[in-house]
Amino acid sequence: MELTYKKATIEDLDLLTETRIKVLRAANQLSDKEDMKEVEKESYHYYQKALLDGSHIAYLVFDRERFVGTGGVCFFQVMPTYHNPCGKKAYIMNMYTLPEYRRRGIAAKTLDMLVKDAWNKGIRAISLEATDMG
């Protein structure tokens, strides 16, 4: 196994969008017959805007040339609170590893990179929802 972790850029829109649909199908137990065209289109536009304005960071993981995993974090603002005076928050999402690559620390390393990105932006309020898959 020869893993590389790449911060996604605008050139990765197609792969990010394709992976987002895979994650949603898996997390929601949707068949390939379920129409996801609208979600796919909106996901593409989301990544297009968010990658450029810095409100989303994603990592792509490859074993040599083969895509094997991903993870992302979106940044947003809420009203300031006592415990979060800046109001900045991060939401980790779209964590995915190909089944045959699971239990090898790929998601853990990706998660660590995403948390570090949030901390580097001064964000301390970070959340993540997990599915039954992990």
Which residues does each predicted region cover?
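Conserved GNAT acetyl-CoA-binding A-motif
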Residues: 111, 118-131
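Conserved GNAT-fold acetyl-CoA-binding loop/helix
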Residues: 24-46
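Conserved acetyl-CoA binding element of GNAT-fold acetyltransferases
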Residues: 83-99
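A short helix-loop-beta-strand connector motif used in the catalytic cores of GNAT acetyltransferases and
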Residues: 45-60
